[in-house]
């Protein structure tokens, strides 16, 4: 016989129909805090009477893009955007003052991602990462004339991948 369980969660909303709280099946209540512009500014948790900070602060630029986040564990991320196209160009993640991720992004004329490069050096993370996980990596993507992903490849440390996709041509329309 199958082990069937029901999980119930709840949510409350403010007068602007924004989530105020989410209650999870284990009793944890996550509260969302908003700035004057109505953007999420921070998130806190209360589980069995223990308060904790999930997201300490989120900063936005005048266009509404997220430019800074600080999590409850102190991890900080900064985001830099291309002013002309408003696309994410660089994302830097730091923890304990050390760079964990340093991603840069490349796009084509229709905003397909062509490449992602992480320039972070895992050997500089000895305090955080004794196993030397992560670090430098690069990924490239190609699209067909309909902007469908047809090729992806990448390399990280001693591993690499290469994926090729193809799409069939529809000869006759589907009839229902």
Where do the PLM segments sit?
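Beta-strand elements of repeat-based all-beta scaffolds
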Residues: 1-176
């Amino acid at each position: 016989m199958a082990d069937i369980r029901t999980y119930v969660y709840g949510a409350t909303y403010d007068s602007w129909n924004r989530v105020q709280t989410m209650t999870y099946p284990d009793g944890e209540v996550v509260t969302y805090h908003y700035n004057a512009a109505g953007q999420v500014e921070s998130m806190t948790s209360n589980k069995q009477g223990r308060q904790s900070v999930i997201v300490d602060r989120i900063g936005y630029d005048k266009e509404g893009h997220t430019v800074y986040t600080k999590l409850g564990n102190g991890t900080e991320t900064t985001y830099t955007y291309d002013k002309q196209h408003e696309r994410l160009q660089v994302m830097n993640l730091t923890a304990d003052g050390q760079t964990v991720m340093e991603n840069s992004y490349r796009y084509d004329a229709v905003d397909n991602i062509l490449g992602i490069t992480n320039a972070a050096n895992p050997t500089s993370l000895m305090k955080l990462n004794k196993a030397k996980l992560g670090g430098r990596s690069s990924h490239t993507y190609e699209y067909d004339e309909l902007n469908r992903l047809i090729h992806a490849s990448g390399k990280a440390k001693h591993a690499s991948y290469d994926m090729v996709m193809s799409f069939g041509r529809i000869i006759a329309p589907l009839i229902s």
